[in-house]
Amino acid sequence: MILLLKNILEFLYKAASAALFGILLLLAFMLTANMGSEAFYGLFRYDYLLLYALIIQFCLLYLKLESWAEAKVIALFHVMAMLMEIFLTHPAIASWQYPQPAVFKILTVPLFAGFMYSAVGSFFARSLRLYQVVFTHLPGFLPMLVLALLSYINFMSKFFIPDIRYLLFFWSIALFWKTRVYFQLSYSRFELPMLPVLLILAFIIWIAENISTFYKIWLYPSQVDAWHMVGWGKLGSWYLLLLLSLVLVLKILGNRDGQGRWQLKKTADK
């Protein structure tokens, strides 16, 4: 019983540490809600959130809570996410909108928005290190990369050609069906199938999305007049987007051998 309690506490502590970037962002969303659309010293809420996110990123690196290698892959995901944001918030598409003004923005997207995706990348990168994660039966990186890129492209191409998300779901199931995730705590080692882990993470992000829209960080068209919970269908979107972040992290921060075993590079923490 004592060992179980120790494992639970250690797991939760490491999970909170890995998700630190995202947790701090959510707290800021709540605490700045009353700022609304008013300007304070020439800047708006989104601008202060950008400065806040930059400070968090600096502190994570300065305090060595995040490595430069991790920061590089997170930055790549950040850029790809911003490109998708610019497309999907264009008035002709309007999948969602940022309802408040900003000084620092690119077209319809405030610059802080990319850091919400950075928080996801940060969680993946830090989790792999904190839990000493090892994957077995991991597919080759080429099929994983093709799946991730097609998922990314489908977010935008579905407005012009048929939506292939269900094909991508089935492909991901076939691809990762045998993949296992091993993670280490001080007193125990655990093994889980990869697919349920991805679904759980997608659900957690869906909860964070509901918090974010409630505090008007962004809004879907149906939420503009009155807030309501984000539809369950968004779980699938987050699941597919997680694949892109995961593949980038796995490719840059680790090595996969010929038997499908993946582990962090020894230099990944430098």
Language-model features, listed with the residues they occupy:
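Aromatic-rich, lipid-facing transmembrane alpha helices and their immediate juxtamembrane interface loops
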Residues: 1-270
